[in-house]
Structure formats: structure tokens, C-alpha cells
């Protein structure tokens, strides 16, 4: 039975999408519901989310953020107040049109995100600069009517946190936006062992209604990218639309400066696709629901279960631990907990008790060692840290080995046909060049850590963006000085690009 269970996992090299689906099902993270695109988070999957939520919640509260809860329904008239925002979400909105048998006077949107609700509330409670800042966070579910779904990565309903803050100055809101992005990045790296690239989205890729959108991007096992979290600076775009004003220190009315940011259960999907293997899930230790499983060997023999229970008592001081005292065979248990990705397995039997030792097996490397029972409380925390570092370093090496630099469009196109991963290239910032790039690749971000890869933009070097169409667009600005500057390519940033075949990207 155990072998059949393991063999049922499709190899990632054969079909990555099916491999992923096999793992989330067989590791008992989720089950499918009767509603298309909605998943049931099983106890093991929800415990993982709870651990992630607990860490994030503590970090947000430590920086002065307060938890609130907004309604799940948004009146259509309220949603329409920010035009760009509405257009960005319109295809994904679910509408409530009836209450019982009665048709509603106004349609209600099932929240795809809660900006409009927070804005309405802020407009009622803010009068003076003394009322600022407001640093709010919400843990909830949202609904986006996706056509193509996959557990954790793209679902009709999903769990997330969304933060919404308002500030007195533009500088404060920008600092908040970047501080949260850094918080997300450190959470991914320090708890999920996922290396990320921090950067800014292009004007075309930014969140609907935002002044600027910042992102953390990760590379999965199959060489495709995942947007793991985003932080948005709204400037005064929403506060002007919703009339969120305050009396400043000089007695003048000003619009508040606003931010919005969020991460979701998509992080669990990223965790799976970065660390897991063809034997099942591999859990980063710091968020694993169970960090150590004890498997008694020949548990029917006198003293074995008692010793396992005694060891559990010691280990639970330093780690999350369970004993499997079921009647299943040790072999079945080994395969089961390998499938579920528990970082450390301890085996204890009569011979081990005689020697005052246990057999310790790492899930990530499958390395086995014999260790004295007296050393477990010291060894296990150190080993959990070793496993975390090993997973992070392995993922970082994979990302770096699958990141390429190009200097012209043809080189980029050839690379996109032959490889999977990230491409780094210079970009001048012009929309015409970005449109040309997107014919072959998907833009991910403009990384904060810049490199000077070439003297010209990857498209400008081929003269595609400085022809008649571009000149006309610049002439429409009626600014000859500006035209003169832009007619000569002056790349100031580079894009991390990811191949167009990516199926896991979901905005928001």
C-alpha cells in the first residue's frame, strides 16, 4: 500500500503540474470541494497556514498594526468610485443579486479585495493629522472568479492577509510600502527558506489604482516564476476618489497617503514547488505543523512505547513532535511521513533502547545518523536550523544557476526558446520596448539590486523603439528637450523576465 502511494506521484520531470497536484492531495493538505475552483483545507494544510499566519501576525503587531474585519460584501456603487481599480478586477468579480427570493436594489460584490471598504471607513474616522497614521490588517478570504484553477496557486476563494494604512505624508506611505515588502521578503527567506528577488513592477504591470507596486518574486523547480507577495503605494489616488481628508499641522485640508499589501495561501504553493521532490512534500522546519515524528519499532515489545513517550516529553520542549503508535507497519509509516514532509524522523526499538540511542533520519537529504537519547534536546534544534539553511541554499543555487543575462532581443528570444528561468536585461523604461519584450517573455520586476549589463536597452539596441511611432508619441508631449533625451537610449534599470509559458502567475 505504501509503495503504491509513493508510486502514484507523477515525477516532476514528466509532468510538473500533475506532480504538484499529486503532492497537495496525497500529503493531505487539501481536498476538492463541490464548487469549481474552491479547495477544502484539511487539518494538515490548515495547520501549516496557521503557523505562517502566527508568525506574520506577530510581526505586524510588533510594528504597530492592528487587526480588523471588514464585511465580505461591497455595494456596486462603492466599487465604482475608483475607476482603474474596478476595471482591474471586473472580470473576476462575483456578484450577489438576490437576498432570498427578492432581487436586491443594488448588486453586491463578494470582495476580491477590500480597498473600497477600508477607504469608506477611513473617510468617516479621520479628521486631523492627530488621527494618523492608521495601520490596519485583515485576515480573511477573498473571491476571484478564476477560469483556470489550481490548489493554493489560483483558486476561486483563498485565504490571505491584506493590510491597509493611511499616512500624513508621501514619505511615510512610501516607507510603509517598502517596510512591508522587506517584512514579506524576510518571512519568505527566514521561515519558508525561499529566496526572493525584491523589485518594482512596471507601470503596465502595477496593481490597478496604485501609484507604484513592489513585489517579491521566486523561482520554482520547473523554472517558472511565482509572485509571492506585493506591496502597493496608492499615493492619494484612492483618498481623492473617496474624499479621505485631514486637517494638517497648518490647518489646511489634505488627502491622506495610502498603502495596501498582502500575501496569501499562494505562499504554500510556492513552498511546495521550491522544496518538494518526487517522494512527496518537503516542509521547511520553522512552519512545519510537525517537526519531529517518532516511529516506535517493534512497539508491541515491553518498554518501547513507554520510551517513545518519554522521548516525546523531552523533545516537545524544543520542537513540535508526535508519536505514531498506530498498528501500521514501520515501512508504511516511513513512507507516510516522507510524503508529508516532516523534517525529522526518529526510530526507536528494543536494540536502540539497550544502546540508549535513536535512529535519526532527515527528510530533505534522507541522511541517517545514530544519536544518544541524552543529546536529543540539544541536537534537534540545531538540526532543524541546518535543514532550513540547507533548503534555502539549495533553492538559491537553483535560482542563480537558472538566471541568465542578455544584451539584445535576439539573444533573449533564443534563450527563451531553450531555457527555463529568469532573464536579466537592460530596459529604457519605454512602453514600446516593454510591449516588444512581452511578445516573448513576461516581465516580473525591476529589481532593487541593480546591475549594469549593457549600454543600451535590450530592445533599443535593435532600434525597435526609436522609430516613427515612438517619435510621434514623444512629440505629442510638446517637449523638445524631453524628446532629445529619449531619442538616445539611456537604460536606467533592468527587468527580471520570465518565460511567457508561466501558468502560475496570479495578480493581486
Curated annotation (Swiss-Prot):
Reaction catalyzed: tRNA(Pro) + L-proline + ATP = L-prolyl-tRNA(Pro) + AMP + diphosphate
Pfam families: HGTP_anticodon, ProRS-C_1, tRNA-synt_2b
Gene3D superfamilies documented for this protein: Anticodon-binding domain, Bira Bifunctional Protein, Domain 2, C-terminal domain of ProRS
The protein's enzyme class: ligase
PROSITE patterns assigned: AA_TRNA_LIGASE_II
Main location: cytoplasm
Compartment list: Cytoplasm
Keywords assigned by UniProt, alphabetized: Aminoacyl-tRNA synthetase, ATP-binding, Cytoplasm, Ligase, Nucleotide-binding, Protein biosynthesis
Domain of life: Bacteria
EC number: 6.1.1.15
One GO CC annotation: aminoacyl-tRNA synthetase multienzyme complex
A molecular-function term among this protein's GO annotations: ATP binding
Domain characteristics, as noted in the entry: Consists of three domains: the N-terminal catalytic domain, the anticodon-binding domain and the C-terminal extension.
Function, as annotated: Catalyzes the attachment of proline to tRNA(Pro) in a two-step reaction: proline is first activated by ATP to form Pro-AMP and then transferred to the acceptor end of tRNA(Pro).
Family label: Belongs to the class-II aminoacyl-tRNA synthetase family. ProS type 3 subfamily.
Protein name: Proline--tRNA ligase 2
Record organism: Bacillus anthracis
